[in-house]
């Protein structure tokens, strides 16, 4: 981020967490988040203008307004069902209390349907 900030013609491709200040929720100084013209009409319409804060952008991603890609799902993969108690406890944490930390670091929390489905898989 700092290299792009110092280069007036610099361009960077990054995770939201690296473009927005975690405290102010606004883009870092000297960083401009370039919006996407989602409907291709050559301008950013009000319903496409959700880049002022990370809170607005995260909400747009969660609501499906921001496309995939560049927004995308992340998965954890294992070789068979995890059996170790500490691994199961970690996965349960991710799907419960850990969800509260997702927005702070530029991720979108999972929907209640997905959380329920994945927690059920841990119980099987």
Task: List the model feature ranges, each with a label.
Residues 1-124:
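Exported/periplasmic ABC-transporter solute-binding proteins
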């Amino acid at each position: 981020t700092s290299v792009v900030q110092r280069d007036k013609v610099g361009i960077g491709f990054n995770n939201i967490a690296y473009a927005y200040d975690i405290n102010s929720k606004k883009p870092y100084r000297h960083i401009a988040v370039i919006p996407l013209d989602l409907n291709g009409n050559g301008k950013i319409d009000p319903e496409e203008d959700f880049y002022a804060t990370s809170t607005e952008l995260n909400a747009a991603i969660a609501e499906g307004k921001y496309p995939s890609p560049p927004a995308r799902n992340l998965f954890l993969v294992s070789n068979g069902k995890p059996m170790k108690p500490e691994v199961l406890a970690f996965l349960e944490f991710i799907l419960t209390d850990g969800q509260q930390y997702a927005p702070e670091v530029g991720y979108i929390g999972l929907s209640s349907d997905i959380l329920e489905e994945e927690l059920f898989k841990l119980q099987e």
